[in-house]
Amino acid sequence: MEAIKMQLPCNFLPQEDGRCGWYEMLPEPPVATPLRGEVKADWVVLGAGFAGLAAARRLGELQPEKKIALIDARRVGFGAAGRNSGFMIDLPHDLSSHSYTGAQDSDLRQIRLNRGAIDYMRDIVKRYAIECDWQERGKFHGAVEPHGIRALEAFAKGLSQLGEPYEELDAHAMKRITGTDFYRAGLHAPGAVQVQPAALVRGLGATLPSNVTLYEDSPVRNIIIGNPHTLVTDLGHLQAPKIVLANNAYAAQFSQLGLKGRILPMYTYGSLTRPLTASEQQTLGGEESWGLLPADPMGSTVRRLANGRICIRNSFTYNPNVRASAQQLKLVLAAHQRSFNKRFPMLPKVAMEYTWGGALCVSRNGGAPFGEINPGVFSAVCQNGLGLTRGTISGKLIAEYALGIKSDLLDYALLQPKPTANPPEPLLSIGVRSTLAWKEWQAGIEL
């Protein structure tokens, strides 16, 4: 069946969205190679985040004689893939759930997929000696008030039912680890990996197979679906008979492919403090480096880094134009400083040095449009808030799916439900924003 010719205008492209500390701490990258002139390839992958990098790498590995083009509007590591909190999470992590877990069969499949992603990434990081502060130290969950403690108990119960190991922690143990007496209860799960996300993404981009060409700073203005498909940029055209969509939240604008109205572009936000002085680190105490997720999914993620900085991540907004406004960033900075001050009152002079927003993509039912959605058009978008793991495994598996390579993990990916339809506007915006406000209010001091 031949692809029906259609045009997909790309009206929403990655913006500045604040100053991302993860990216700003890296050295200057080598000069970018933008797309120029008329270029032809066997495959084109749109978006150089975790899904796109994994898809391009796997296509290059499996078809070394083919020409693979990977294209991104910005520098690798600048976009959403370099703007998260740096957790590769192995366990269920349903942001719409009260306690992250859901139906047991689905959770078990997701664990297999997440660990498949971690295994694949670990091999790449070791093989190419990618410097990204890779730490296999698991993750903590922390709770403050009764609502959060109940969520933590529900998470622990879910892990027990799944046969997953964990350690429950009391307030004294949490203070010994974090240096603060803010948390009343906690839990440690050993399987997660913590990384410097922008460093990891940049390292992945620098170690692609030789038959993969990376085009950066090349915003795609229009996509012509046909035979072949054509991507139009400011400086050229890129043609290929097959395309992998790995642009996550930015794919929500593609109504003709059935994605608009089913996946939602959301934003969450992070801040990094200045480095703590030696005196401040001594005052804080606790372990030198740790990472903590909130018991309530709407609460604050906190990481203490070995370089002396502390990362705060909280606040969700619905941004259908896939950009964060200056006003949103101003409000978020104030919210992050409040969250920091609540947790670390012994550090009254520590301020945020960087604050940024990052796009993520979710669906109402946690589903993803994984597979071939139009002849020669393959989708690896909508990671539902788990970009590092789901993005990585979605990208790897979509390449294998496109080439007819079967596996248990691919079967699990294909069992994911497709995204359900969203209500029409303005009901959608009203509903999403009121739900976010209600859930943040419920999170209370956990935020």
Which residue stretches match the model-derived regions?
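Glycine-rich FAD pyrophosphate-binding loop
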Residues: 60-83
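Extreme N-terminal leader/targeting segments of oxidoreductases
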Residues: 1-43, 61-62, 66-67
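Helical element adjacent to the flavin cofactor pocket in flavoenzyme catalytic cores
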Residues: 150, 157-160, 182-241
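Internal hydrophobic alpha-helix adjacent to the cofactor/substrate pocket in enzyme cavities
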Residues: 60, 339, 391-411
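Active-site substrate-recognition segment that forms the wall
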Residues: 119, 127-135, 220-222, 236-375
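Dinucleotide-binding Rossmann-like beta1-alpha1 core, especially the glycine-rich loop
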Residues: 91-171
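Active-site-proximal substrate-binding core of FAD-dependent oxidoreductases
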Residues: 362, 374, 401-435
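Glycine-rich Rossmann-fold phosphate-binding loop(s) that bind the pyrophosphate
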Residues: 47-51, 73
